[in-house]
């Protein structure tokens, strides 16, 4: 499972978003709208993505 990668892109701005979700977005390494990061596909990252699923777009990449 760890050999897969996820491309996570922030699709919405953070104005009006709860503090917990903002901290999760920052922990994923996202900074601004349309910013993307590549993360390993782990259960921890999947849980973070599920928490902010309305704010991000996820693409699966093969490593």
Swiss-Prot record:
Domain of life: Bacteria
CDD domains, A to Z: Ribosomal_L30
Keyword Protein biosynthesis carried by entry: no
SUPFAM superfamilies: Ribosomal protein L30p/L7e
Database matches in InterPro entries: Ribo_uL30_ferredoxin-like_sf, Ribosomal_uL30_bac-type, Ribosomal_uL30_CS, Ribosomal_uL30_ferredoxin-like
GO biological-process terms attached to the record: translation
One GO term describing the cellular component: cytosolic large ribosomal subunit
Keyword annotations: Ribonucleoprotein, Ribosomal protein
GO molecular function, one term: structural constituent of ribosome
HAMAP family, per database record: Ribosomal_uL30_B
Subunit and interaction comment: Part of the 50S ribosomal subunit.
Family recorded in the similarity comment: Belongs to the universal ribosomal protein uL30 family.
Protein known as: Large ribosomal subunit protein uL30
Provenance organism: Natranaerobius thermophilus (strain ATCC BAA-1301 / DSM 18059 / JW/NM-WN-LF)
Protein's gene: rpmD
């Amino acid at each position: 499972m760890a050999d897969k990668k996820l491309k996570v892109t922030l699709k919405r701005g953070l104005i009006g978003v709860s503090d917990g979700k903002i901290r999760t977005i920052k922990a994923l390494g996202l900074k601004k709208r349309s910013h993307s990061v590549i993360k390993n596909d782990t259960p921890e990252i999947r849980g973070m993505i599920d928490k902010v699923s309305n704010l991000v777009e996820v693409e699966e990449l093969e490593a």
